[in-house]
Amino acid sequence: MAFVDSTGTDFYLVATSVAATTKAECTTAIATAKRIKNLKTFGDIGGTRTVSESKFLSADDSIKSMGSISYGNMPVECLFDSADTEGQSILKTAYSDKSERKMIIKNTDGTFTVLNVKISASMKTYNIDEFVIYKATIEQNSEAVEIIA
């Protein structure tokens, strides 16, 4: 069984119209994509469902109904780079214009994870004796698809 190491993973943003359903399409897409550089953290990809539980007077039991999916968000941090015209710039632009982007994650085993995202937060953090950090919150806006072939 092969495991995927997170160190070395690359994160790219492209227009939602860019084809990314095969490894070849993903490789072509990231060749001209905006890469998020100096990424320190990335949150969890996935979602949860609302659960409704019904109980009955006539039985000591209950049933559960699974609601629709609510996708999560990923708080990301990277070293601030004012000259970064790629990743940090596109995160700021997507935040400002409220636009959706397609994120292509190149995993270290050569596979890809693809999902649509929006940006709900964009900020910088200044701490004593630390690098300036650029922070964004990436909102997952579609199911994540694993591209393995």
Question: What is the predicted role of each segment?
Answer:
Residues 73-92:
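Charged, amphipathic alpha-helical segments
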Residues 8, 17, 47, 85, ...:
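Short linear sequence elements within intrinsically disordered, low-complexity coil regions
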Residues 87-89, 146-149:
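Short, charged, solvent-exposed linker or helix-capping segments at domain edges/interfaces
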Residues 1-77, 120-132:
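Solvent-exposed edge beta-strands and adjacent loop segments
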Residues 95, 99-107:
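Residue microenvironments linked to proteolytic maturation
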Residues 105-148:
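Short beta-strand and beta-hairpin "edge-sheet" elements
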Residues 1-4, 86-97:
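Short linear motifs in intrinsically disordered
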